[in-house]
Structure formats: C-alpha cells, structure tokens
C-alpha cells in the first residue's frame, strides 16, 4: 500500500483483486488494508474511483487493478 499526501487529502492506493466489490463498500476489507483499528467502521471517504482495470469476457480483471481511496486528514 502506498500513501501520498496532497494538501489536506490523503490518497491511499490499494491493489486489490476485486475493485468493483471494494467500491460497493466492503468496509472490513477496506479497513484491513488501511490498517485501521476497528473493522466495523469505515474511513471518512470522500470518493472512491478505480483506474487501470478491464473486464474481460470471463469477468476477470486485468492486473494490477488499482483502488484509490481519498479521505480527509
């Protein structure tokens, strides 16, 4: 996992095998990857967007899919 700071927004770049499921709020997985203490709570996410993935005919993803989570610091 890679963290980058730009102003007051922290961008967390996560490579995951199923970015669409992550987008729809698997908070335990998101928190586990972010390393937060409570798996039941979700970070204060401003927006989630996905880059660099392709859905093939078999509904598998090209790698590496990239999930980008941005939250207020």
From Swiss-Prot:
Domain of life of the source: Eukaryota
Protein name: Uncharacterized protein C29A4.22
Organism of this sequence: Schizosaccharomyces pombe (strain 972 / ATCC 24843)
């Amino acid at each position: 996992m890679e963290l980058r700071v730009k102003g007051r927004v922290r961008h967390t770049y996560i490579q995951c095998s199923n970015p669409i499921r992550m987008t729809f709020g698997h908070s335990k997985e998101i928190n586990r990857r972010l390393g937060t203490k409570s798996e039941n709570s979700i970070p204060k996410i401003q927006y989630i967007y996905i880059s660099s993935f392709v859905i093939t005919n078999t509904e598998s993803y090209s790698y590496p899919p990239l999930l980008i989570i941005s939250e207020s610091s």
